[in-house]
Curated annotation (Swiss-Prot):
Belongs to the type I cytokine receptor family. Type 4 subfamily. The gene is IL7R. This is Interleukin-7 receptor subunit alpha. The IL7 receptor is a heterodimer of IL7R and IL2RG. The TSLP receptor is a heterodimer of CRLF2 and IL7R. Interacts with CD53. It comes from Equus caballus (Horse). N-glycosylated IL-7Ralpha binds IL7 300-fold more tightly than the unglycosylated form. Ubiquitinated by MARCHF8; leading to lysosomal degradation.
Length: 458
């Protein structure tokens, strides 16, 4: 009996020692297990395998002995109250489609069926997207740019579709000099001028939820992709740009030449019209005349010019007006036939013209200057021309022909037997009782006044 009791005592002691090393406390010895740090963190991935969601948790302290530890989630589930996690190495996870995705859930760490520590969290606020994949870089030589494209599985998902992607790239020789670009699409364009020529670059992408309801963490980095930039071709010039530059240069040169040639004749008069200088005009008007002028008002200098008095011009005009009012116009053929019997005997029998004096401005026309005589004492000038002809000449007077005064008529008007022609009878009573004859029809003997030439400024 003594040997049997000793054996049971040693076994009990060994079991107690082994249980103490594994962190398992028995008989209410739970205070020793609470001395360790069992803090943990979790994240969710929605629709990882169809409708199933994934929730993963891990201890923040990697030195924690997790051999006998378990994870349990309660609340925020469909049809069940609690679910236990599965363990894969140092990670605890659960894949199910029973997450309610509304409200908070409680996750606890259990040791021997007892809760050591618990946390409350909302699964939709701890979403960690899946890492992007299939990162490609394509060089477009025409545009001198690199097009970066990648893919993500969230494009086909129902819940977390809107993501913000962070694209980073660097030179391979610069380990920590990353360039960051945030985009909401799966396509990015990098300009060649912002990259170093003939260099190798590394690029990768990660994502994060970009909605108000779903929040969480950055995803894992995608696999890195590498690309090389081409050599610098700054010495070469595009032929199209070269042709455009040459044509533009010659066009500008041609316009400059034409502007210089046509400036004075065509362009300047239109753009800047020349205005007369008022100063020069006033100087010419106010300028004193020269001493030796060709202008002279001496009457002797006008001896070679024929000057007519203004009184003669006025007398001629009054005679024209009187004759036009006194004598009727020419008779037409019918009147000539009607008067033919009396005219045949008087058909220019002597071809003489009778000149009668006229007192201009008086009451009685064609009165004789002597007063009471039977026939006016006027000279008769022979003429061999028909009635419609006039004698020409500078000194010969122009008179009406065919005007006859019958015998026995005293201070009477001329008979209206023949029509008057273009000649006009004028009488200039310069001397009392002696009639003067003046031509009124010829343009050569029209009265004019000769004035001196005006001085022209040279």
């Amino acid at each position: 009996m003594t040997i049997l009791g000793t054996t049971f005592g040693m076994v009990f002691y060994l079991l107690q020692v082994v249980s103490g090393e594994s962190g398992y406390a028995q008989n209410g010895d739970f205070e020793d297990a609470e001395l360790d740090d069992y803090s943990f963190s979790c994240y969710s991935q929605l629709e990882v395998d169809g409708p199933q969601h994934l929730l993963s948790c891990a201890f923040e302290d990697p030195d924690v002995n997790s051999t006998n530890l378990e994870f349990e989630i309660c609340e925020g589930l469909l049809e069940v109250k609690c679910l236990n996690f599965s363990k894969l190495q140092e990670t605890y996870f659960i894949k199910t489609k029973k997450f309610l995705l509304i409200g908070d859930s409680t996750i606890c760490v259990k040791l021997g069926g007892k809760h050591i520590t618990c946390q409350k969290l909302n699964i939709v606020k701890r979403v960690k997207p899946e890492a992007p994949f299939d990162v490609k870089v394509i060089y477009r030589e025409e545009a001198n740019e690199f097009v970066v494209t990648f893919n993500t599985s969230h494009l086909q998902k129902k819940y977390v579709k809107d993501l913000l992607h962070e694209v980073v790239y660097r030179l391979e020789k610069n380990e920590n000099d990353w360039m960051h670009v945030n985009i909401s699409s799966t396509k990015l364009t990098l300009l060649q001028r912002k990259l170093q020529p003939n260099a190798m670059y590394e690029i990768k992408v990660r994502s994060i939820p970009n909605t108000n309801y779903f929040e969480g963490f950055w995803s894992e980095w995608s696999p890195s992709s590498h690309f090389r930039t081409p050599e610098n071709n700054s010495g070469k010039m595009d032929p199209v740009l070269l042709i455009i530059s040459i044509v533009s240069f010659f066009s500008v040169a041609l316009m400059v030449i034409l502007a210089c040639v046509l400036w004075k004749k065509r362009i300047k008069p239109i753009v800047w019209p020349s205005l007369p200088d008022h100063k020069k005009t006033l100087e010419q008007l106010c300028k004193k005349p020269k001493k030796n002028l060709n202008v002279s008002f001496n009457p002797e200098s006008f001896l070679d010019c024929q000057i007519h008095k203004v009184d003669g011009i006025q007398a001629r005009d009054e005679a024209e007006a009187f004759l036009q009012d006194t004598f009727p116009p020419q008779l037409d053929d019918s009147e000539k036939q009607r008067l033919g019997g009396g005219v045949q005997g008087l058909n220019w029998p002597s071809q003489h013209a009778v000149i009668t004096p006229k007192t201009f401005g008086g009451e009685s026309p064609l009165r004789c200057l002597s007063g009471s005589v039977t026939v006016c004492d006027v000279p008769v000038i022979p003429s061999s021309r028909p009635p419609d002809c006039r004698e020409g000449g500078k000194n010969g007077p122009h008179v009406y022909q065919g005007l006859l005064l019958g015998a026995g008529t005293t201070n009477s008007t001329l008979p209206h037997l023949f029509p008057f022609q273009s000649g006009i009878l004028t009488l200039n009573p310069a001397v009392q009782g002696q009639p003067l004859f003046t031509s009124l029809g010829s343009s050569q003997e029209e009265a004019y006044v000769t004035m001196s030439s005006f001085y022209q400024n040279q």
